[in-house]
A protein has these predicted regions:
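A glycine-centric feature that highlights glycine-enriched low-complexity/repetitive segments
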Residues: 1-100
Length: 100
C-alpha cells in the first residue's frame, strides 16, 4: 500500500513561490519583446532585411510559446493553490471527526 503525505502549508508556500517566479519570467519576456521581435536590418541590402526578418520571426515564435507556457504556469499554480485548500479542509474535517 502506498501512502501520500501532503502538507497544506508547504503546498501554499510552493504556489506562492511559483507565482513569484512566473511574474519574474513574464516581466522579462515582456521587456525583451520589442528587442527580439522588431529587429532592424544591419544594412540597406536585401540579405540584411531577410536576416532581420528571420530573427524577428524567431522572436515572435518565442513570444507565442512564452504566452502558452505562462497560461500553463498560471493553471498549474492555481491547481496547487486549490490543492492546498482541499488538503487543509480535509485535515480539518479529519481532526474534527476524531474529536467527536
Amino acid at each position: 500500500m502506498s501512502y501520500m503525505i501532503a502538507v497544506p502549508d508547504m503546498l501554499s508556500s510552493a504556489a506562492g513561490d511559483l507565482a513569484s517566479i512566473g511574474s519574474s519570467i513574464n516581466a522579462s519576456t515582456r521587456a525583451a519583446a520589442a528587442a527580439t521581435t522588431r529587429l532592424l536590418p544591419a544594412a540597406a541590402d536585401e540579405v540584411s532585411a531577410h536576416i532581420a526578418a528571420l530573427f524577428s520571426g524567431h522572436g515572435e515564435g518565442y513570444q507565442a510559446i512564452a504566452r502558452q507556457m505562462a497560461a500553463f504556469h498560471d493553471q498549474f499554480t492555481l491547481a496547487l493553490t486549490s490543492s492546498a485548500g482541499a488538503y487543509a479542509s480535509a485535515e480539518a474535517t479529519n481532526v474534527e471527526q476524531q474529536v467527536l
